[in-house]
Amino acid sequence: MPTVMPDVANQTQAQTEGALDWVGMSNIEVPLMVAAAGVPERPVAAKVEAFVNLKNPKTKGIHMSRLYLLLDKMSTEGELSHDTLKQLLNDFIESHKDISDQAFIKFDFDYHLRRKSLISKKQGWKAYPVSLTGRYDAGQLKLELSVDVPYSSTCPCSAALARQLIQDAFSEKFAGQEQVDASIMHEWLGSTEGIVATPHSQRSVAEVKVALSDSVNDFPIVELIDAIEGALKTPVQAAVKREDEQEFARLNGQNLMFCEDASRRLQHQLNQMSNFRDFWLRVNHYESLHAHDAVSVTTKGVPGGYSA
């Protein structure tokens, strides 16, 4: 009876020879503690992709269990930070040192933040989809952070058309009157007869991806989310009372946006942030008027960097 279990990956050569760019696993479910700048560490439930290259064309395969166990060790013994991510990628390569010299990992998770309402200051949770990606190649670490931030966009064209209809309704209602009593006007403006039209608006999402500088240790997740919401002015809310809804309506009216406007606001904001070497962004306006979406994509324009 054999006493040693066979190791096909080590003991067998590839049937068809060829180097492979990436081999590994996806959809690994892992709980993690994430170190984000400016806030305490917090737990997340992540789905992970873990890969190494296979540079030896004759090698049958990689040792996936080694990658899995290294990831599990980080999950149970440490936190996800710049240093631990770099060490994890180094360990991936070291565990395959004869057949691999590149490593890749990606963490996808929802990052929950407490958000105050606009006026009442009630609080609620908002979940932001986040991805952290690391690649180690030729001794260099490349880190990337991406977030999705929902917001409201109100169409400038639709707002102008609605205002025109209100003007027409006013002219019809008070035709022939040289003067109109202020109290009557006030009451009329507060009625559906007075406000005969409203502009269309829709939930929208900003997808933002940034290349992190080498000096980053704790990930600037909250900083990036705050910057996006601050530039757009109309983030989707959590807890909402009537006074908050009214303020949200005011903010939408004062921040009318085509997708081009939203994209340029974010472009301007991200250009001011020195801890991001590069960025790529896409704004998606999920139109309530049209059956299609309105989309704008732009980048920082770094030579050799992200492309649209």
Swiss-Prot record:
Specify the domain of life of the species encoding this protein.
Bacteria
Presence of the UniProt keyword Hydrolase in the record:
yes
**Do you know which InterPro entries this protein is assigned to?**
GTP_cyclohydrolase_FolE2, GTP_cyclohydrolase_FolE2/MptA
Q: Which terms in the Gene Ontology molecular function aspect does this entry carry?
A: GTP cyclohydrolase I activity
Which residues are marked as site: May be catalytically important? 155
Enzyme class name: hydrolase
What's the EC number here? 3.5.4.16
Q: In which pathway does it act?
A: Cofactor biosynthesis; 7,8-dihydroneopterin triphosphate biosynthesis; 7,8-dihydroneopterin triphosphate from GTP: step 1/1
Q: Which UniProt keywords apply?
A: Hydrolase
The protein's annotated catalytic reaction(s) are:
GTP + H2O = 7,8-dihydroneopterin 3'-triphosphate + formate + H(+)
Q: Which family does it belong to?
A: Belongs to the GTP cyclohydrolase IV family.
The name under which this protein is listed is GTP cyclohydrolase FolE2
What organism is recorded for this protein? Idiomarina loihiensis (strain ATCC BAA-735 / DSM 15497 / L2-TR)
Phylogenetic placement of the source organism = Bacteria, Pseudomonadati, Pseudomonadota, Gammaproteobacteria, Alteromonadales
Q: Which gene encodes it?
A: folE2
